[in-house]
């Protein structure tokens, strides 16, 4: 038996001990945990190369993908190669990596990984098990999305081997996407792909019968097949065609497999594990015609630089479907007993919900019975900034859909503030609510809510023991007080002596004369024409005093005096 210390398995953060014996090899983490074993009959090939923590032994297994053991010393090569030759009958191949730094080369599709070679030396390899999705990003460009770490919160011990073939304990920074530019055309042969002026990437003959196609398309199709992203990812239990998705926007076919489901669109394809579904909502729309199925994903769905933490489907309530599951009776009775039925014949939204629930094991969350809107619906129409949507009130949370999908847990809510923005007439018909979160976690504002929904919202938040701050009553009192002040000012003006003569300076500052009720189209005629008859309640003399520019402020001045001052004002105005 050969033993090696401080060896890292599959990019783990924690080292362990690796042991080789005639029956196979094993690895146990130093801090304790599950032991990984590999039977000798499952070892297909082995490669030795320089790596991050010293030297790496890469084992290509017959059924378990790629196993990476890093941390060996250079002197360990002789012991390892001798043990593999005697016990397993395998020669350990010593490989040197390409260190030129070139970003162009040849792609090689091996049994378990995609290798990128520069001058016939590997620059890097990507195991197929690490590829979550691939898309045609352009005519000659293929995007490859990589799986995120199994447990981003680090709840599992470092070095865990429960998810073979995936990163056991990755660091905080990860590579999530790569893009390959593949120009020109290529020929797909029986044994591989041959470029226009290049040798075959997978070797073999028979290119005479091959059909010349776009090289990027062939690369994409072969990667889909190797990484088991497409139809070859096991047996399809059920398929739903042309389902409308609001987030991400488009129509997708849904293929449901044993451990994952796939969304197939015209431009993008997505492969999503059921284990990524953290929340499952069934939300009826206010139009009584459609319903929404919302899936909360962690890690979120990615489309380039855009993340979609929620998947939102919209389905018609009256659309019936007849579906028979593509599943053996034995599998249905053992693994999915009381979870799935062999045949469904009911509305499509119920069928999709039941199959998703059966395969993922997630509980379906529906709107709370404690809330009914003014019009008898489960959702309230509102908007986040310029995006309109529906806000649903659940037993333990709030959710706004479709875009941007926003999820708020009740336990994190500190206070809900109801307010009216601005003093426009429309503000009296609508109001806003601001949900402030505890511990400075921020706030969410929902705008343009119908005024009739105020009472149902207040009753719901009170039932959930959430503090409510109503700023609308303060705004209403302020508006009423301002209106009363305006009425007092108008009545005092009409009485004549209620307001003192403020002089011409104050008259110039007036933007609107609310007491003006003249039949004439000219303000100047009312102010200066002595023959003009006011429609107000006071006498001509009182109106003249009120219109005086303040040249003579003596209260005993008669009307003749006022008339003598008027020509001066006219000549002053004309300058």
From Swiss-Prot:
<feature type="compositionally biased region" description="Acidic residues">
    <location>
        <begin position="541"/>
        <end position="563"/>
    </location>
</feature>
<dbReference type="InterPro" id="IPR024954">
    <property type="entry name" value="SSRP1_DD"/>
</dbReference>
<dbReference type="GO" id="GO:0031509">
    <property type="term" value="P:subtelomeric heterochromatin formation"/>
</dbReference>
<comment type="function">
    <text>Component of the FACT complex, a general chromatin factor that acts to reorganize nucleosomes. The FACT complex is involved in multiple processes that require DNA as a template such as mRNA elongation, DNA replication and DNA repair. During transcription elongation the FACT complex acts as a histone chaperone that both destabilizes and restores nucleosomal structure.</text>
</comment>
<dbReference type="GO" id="GO:0045899">
    <property type="term" value="P:positive regulation of RNA polymerase II transcription preinitiation complex assembly"/>
</dbReference>
<dbReference type="Pfam" id="PF17292">
    <property type="entry name" value="POB3_N"/>
</dbReference>
<dbReference type="GO" id="GO:0034728">
    <property type="term" value="P:nucleosome organization"/>
</dbReference>
<dbReference type="GO" id="GO:0031508">
    <property type="term" value="P:pericentric heterochromatin formation"/>
</dbReference>
<dbReference type="InterPro" id="IPR013719">
    <property type="entry name" value="RTT106/SPT16-like_middle_dom"/>
</dbReference>
<dbReference type="InterPro" id="IPR038167">
    <property type="entry name" value="SSRP1_sf"/>
</dbReference>
<feature type="compositionally biased region" description="Acidic residues">
    <location>
        <begin position="506"/>
        <end position="528"/>
    </location>
</feature>
<dbReference type="GO" id="GO:0035101">
    <property type="term" value="C:FACT complex"/>
</dbReference>
<dbReference type="Pfam" id="PF21103">
    <property type="entry name" value="PH1_SSRP1-like"/>
</dbReference>
<dbReference type="InterPro" id="IPR011993">
    <property type="entry name" value="PH-like_dom_sf"/>
</dbReference>
<dbReference type="Pfam" id="PF08512">
    <property type="entry name" value="Rttp106-like_middle"/>
</dbReference>
<keyword id="KW-0158">Chromosome</keyword>
<dbReference type="GO" id="GO:0000781">
    <property type="term" value="C:chromosome, telomeric region"/>
</dbReference>
<dbReference type="GO" id="GO:0006261">
    <property type="term" value="P:DNA-templated DNA replication"/>
</dbReference>
<feature type="compositionally biased region" description="Basic and acidic residues">
    <location>
        <begin position="496"/>
        <end position="505"/>
    </location>
</feature>
<keyword id="KW-0805">Transcription regulation</keyword>
<dbReference type="GO" id="GO:0006281">
    <property type="term" value="P:DNA repair"/>
</dbReference>
<feature type="region of interest" description="Disordered">
    <location>
        <begin position="148"/>
        <end position="169"/>
    </location>
</feature>
<keyword id="KW-0804">Transcription</keyword>
<dbReference type="GO" id="GO:0006335">
    <property type="term" value="P:DNA replication-dependent chromatin assembly"/>
</dbReference>
<keyword id="KW-0227">DNA damage</keyword>
<feature type="compositionally biased region" description="Acidic residues">
    <location>
        <begin position="485"/>
        <end position="495"/>
    </location>
</feature>
<feature type="region of interest" description="Disordered">
    <location>
        <begin position="191"/>
        <end position="211"/>
    </location>
</feature>
<feature type="compositionally biased region" description="Basic and acidic residues">
    <location>
        <begin position="191"/>
        <end position="204"/>
    </location>
</feature>
<keyword id="KW-0539">Nucleus</keyword>
<dbReference type="InterPro" id="IPR035417">
    <property type="entry name" value="SSRP1/POB3_N"/>
</dbReference>
<dbReference type="GO" id="GO:0042393">
    <property type="term" value="F:histone binding"/>
</dbReference>
<dbReference type="GO" id="GO:0003677">
    <property type="term" value="F:DNA binding"/>
</dbReference>
<keyword id="KW-0235">DNA replication</keyword>
<feature type="region of interest" description="Disordered">
    <location>
        <begin position="484"/>
        <end position="575"/>
    </location>
</feature>
<dbReference type="InterPro" id="IPR050454">
    <property type="entry name" value="RTT106/SSRP1_HistChap/FACT"/>
</dbReference>
<comment type="subunit">
    <text>Forms a stable heterodimer with spt16. The spt16-pob3 dimer weakly associates with multiple molecules of nhp6 to form the FACT complex.</text>
</comment>
<protein>
    <recommendedName>
        <fullName>FACT complex subunit pob3</fullName>
    </recommendedName>
</protein>
<keyword id="KW-0234">DNA repair</keyword>
<dbReference type="InterPro" id="IPR000969">
    <property type="entry name" value="SSRP1/POB3"/>
</dbReference>
<dbReference type="Pfam" id="PF03531">
    <property type="entry name" value="SSrecog"/>
</dbReference>
<comment type="similarity">
    <text>Belongs to the SSRP1 family.</text>
</comment>
<dbReference type="GO" id="GO:0030466">
    <property type="term" value="P:silent mating-type cassette heterochromatin formation"/>
</dbReference>
């Amino acid at each position: 038996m050969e033993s090696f210390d401080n060896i890292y398995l599959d990019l783990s953060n924690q080292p362990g001990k690796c042991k080789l014996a005639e029956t196979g090899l094993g690895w146990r983490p130093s801090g304790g945990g599950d032991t990984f074993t590999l039977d000798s009959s499952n070892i297909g090939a082995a490669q030795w190369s320089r790596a991050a923590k010293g030297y790496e032994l890469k084992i290509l297994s017959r059924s378990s993908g790629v196993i990476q053991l890093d941390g060996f010393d250079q002197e360990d090569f002789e012991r390892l190669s001798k043990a593999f030759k005697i016990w397993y009958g395998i020669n350990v191949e010593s490989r040197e990596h390409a260190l030129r730094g070139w970003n162009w080369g040849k792609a090689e599709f091996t049994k378990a990984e995609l290798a990128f070679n520069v001058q016939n030396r590997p620059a890097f390899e990507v195991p197929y098990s690490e590829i979550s999705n691939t898309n045609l990003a352009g005519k000659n460009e293929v995007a490859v999305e990589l799986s995120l770490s199994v447990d981003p919160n680090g709840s599992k011990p470092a070095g865990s081997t429960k998810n073979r073939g995936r990163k056991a304990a990755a660091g905080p920074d990860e590579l999530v996407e790569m893009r390959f530019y593949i120009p020109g055309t290529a020929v797909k042969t029986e044994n591989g792909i041959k470029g226009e002026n290049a040798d075959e990437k997978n070797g073999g003959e028979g290119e005479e019968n091959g059909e010349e196609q776009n090289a990027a398309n062939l690369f994409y199709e072969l990667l889909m097949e190797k990484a088991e992203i497409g139809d070859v990812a096991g047996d399809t239990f059920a398929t739903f065609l042309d389902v409308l998705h609001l987030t991400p926007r488009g129509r997708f076919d849904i293929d449901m497999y044993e451990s994952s489901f796939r969304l197939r669109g015209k431009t993008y394809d997505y492969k999503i594990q059921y284990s990524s579904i953290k929340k499952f909502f069934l939300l009826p729309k206010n139009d009584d015609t459609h319903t929404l199925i919302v899936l909360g994903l962690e890690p979120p769905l990615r489309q380039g630089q855009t993340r979609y933490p929620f998947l939102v489907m919209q389905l018609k309530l009256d659309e019936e479907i007849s579906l028979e599951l593509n599943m053996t009776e034995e599998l249905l009775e053992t693994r999915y007993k009381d979870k799935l039925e062999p045949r469904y014949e009911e509305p499509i939204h119920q069928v999709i919900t039941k199959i998703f629930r059966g395969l993922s094991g997630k509980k379906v969350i529906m709107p709370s019975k404690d809330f009914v809107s003014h019009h008898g619906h489960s959702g309230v129409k509102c908007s986040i900034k310029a995006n309109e949507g529906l806000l649903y009130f659940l037993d333990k949370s709030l959710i706004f859909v479709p875009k941007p999908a926003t999820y708020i847990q009740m336990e994190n809510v500190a206070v809900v503030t109801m307010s009216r923005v601005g003093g426009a007439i429309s503000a009296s018909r609508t109001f806003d609510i601001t949900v402030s979160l505890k511990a400075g976690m921020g706030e969410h504002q929902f705008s343009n809510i119908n005024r009739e929904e105020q009472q149902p919202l207040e009753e719901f938040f009170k039932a959930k023991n959430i503090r409510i701050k109503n700023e609308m009553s303060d705004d209403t009192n302020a508006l009423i007080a301002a209106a009363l002040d305006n009425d007092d000012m108008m009545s005092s003006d009409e009485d004549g002596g209620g307001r003192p003569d403020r002089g011409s300076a104050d008259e110039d500052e007036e933007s609107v004369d609310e007491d003006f009720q003249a039949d004439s189209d000219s303000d100047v005629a009312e102010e200066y024409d002595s023959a003009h008859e006011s429609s107000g309640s006071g006498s001509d003399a009182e109106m003249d005093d009120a219109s005086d520019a303040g040249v003579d402020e003596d209260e005993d001045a008669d009307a003749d005096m006022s008339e003598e001052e008027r020509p001066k004002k006219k000549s002053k105005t004309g300058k």
